[in-house]
Amino acid sequence: MAVTLAALVERFGGELVGDSARSVRQVAPLDRACADDIGFVSQSKYLAELATTGAGAVILPPDARDATDLPRILTPNPYLYFARVSALLNPPPRPAAGVHPAATVAADAEVAADASIAAGAVIGSGARIGARSVIGANSVVGDGARVGEDCLLHANVSLYHGCQVGDRVILHAGCVIGADGFGFAPNEGRWEKIPQIGRVLIGDDVEVGACTTIDRGALEDTVIEEGVKLDNLIQVAHNVVIGAHSAIAACTGIAGSAKIGRHCTIGGAAMIFGHIEIADGTRISTNTLITKSLPKRGTYTSALPFSEHEVWQKNAVHMRNLDKLVTRVKQLEKRLNELENKT
């Protein structure tokens, strides 16, 4: 697929400088781009690459208008513009509508005529699959579950009974939506299972990465609001609420009944304690442990930066002796005060 720069500007806006008839076929990084590619620069430190790039055109911020003679589109947010161009040039493959002969669909399930159900997929009793949605190979949509319009469930997704997915949702391979939450009552040294009778409710325009698990609620529902983006290998426990348009990176764990606000960003491998609330717009750095509520919007970090092993060992020894050091400092302060009082 080839598209002219003029067509891109007509579709996405921006200011075009140079040859409007120049066609591009693909997006590419500046250092590997060829004449049929369009690249982008969103940070000034990369402007020097414009001198050597083979790209046929570039996307730049307005203040970089004169940084190159290449045909260019000027826009306040080059990264967003690049994303939209990439989506235009790389449309996802669309399987044919219909139910594969090797799929299993319950007699009372409702599947839109233009939906696609792949081989090995199972659609349970009373389940509903919306218009133009795609259910990948060997995926399971449980009894009474709902999948909205224009959704994509990749291969081997499990959507448990009663759970609901909004419109334009993407669930990547290996997702498990609606498994039982980790609920057990102690009884004389043993554990008795607590039925998890809530659901998982996923809003519109959500994307969930591969092998991420979202547990169903114990009594109330686990809720993923609209526009949330979850990376791979995330654990979302029962009764969690993740606010709209928050983004969470891989390997993060969120314990039960935590409430994460809207427009939050959480770095990879962060750990969130249960039964706490995090304010809208909060940023949490990678590998950070959040042990209590964050009522104030801000950026929070708890991870220690790396060091050479020998240096780390020495610092670890100092950490273990902090109590002794604090005691010695207090004793010294006391003696200094006594000396000052005598004089």
UniProtKB/Swiss-Prot annotation:
It catalyses: a UDP-3-O-[(3R)-3-hydroxyacyl]-alpha-D-glucosamine + a (3R)-hydroxyacyl-[ACP] = a UDP-2-N,3-O-bis[(3R)-3-hydroxyacyl]-alpha-D-glucosamine + holo-[ACP] + H(+). It is an enzyme of class 2 (transferase). GO terms for biological process: lipid A biosynthetic process. Pathway: Bacterial outer membrane biogenesis; LPS lipid A biosynthesis. Keywords: Acyltransferase, Lipid A biosynthesis, Lipid biosynthesis, Lipid metabolism, Repeat, Transferase. Its EC number is 2.3.1.191. It comes from the Bacteria. The keyword Cell division does not apply. The active site is at 238 (proton acceptor). One of its GO terms (molecular function) is N-acyltransferase activity. Coiled coil: none annotated. One of its GO terms (cellular component) is membrane. The keyword Acyltransferase applies. Catalyzes the N-acylation of UDP-3-O-acylglucosamine using 3-hydroxyacyl-ACP as the acyl donor. Is involved in the biosynthesis of lipid A, a phosphorylated glycolipid that anchors the lipopolysaccharide to the outer membrane of the cell. Homotrimer. Belongs to the transferase hexapeptide repeat family. LpxD subfamily. PANTHER family: UDP-3-O-ACYLGLUCOSAMINE N-ACYLTRANSFERASE (PTHR43378), UDP-3-O-ACYLGLUCOSAMINE N-ACYLTRANSFERASE 1, MITOCHONDRIAL-RELATED (PTHR43378:SF2). This is UDP-3-O-acylglucosamine N-acyltransferase. It comes from Thiobacillus denitrificans (strain ATCC 25259 / T1). The lineage of its organism: Bacteria, Pseudomonadati, Pseudomonadota, Betaproteobacteria, Nitrosomonadales. The gene is lpxD.
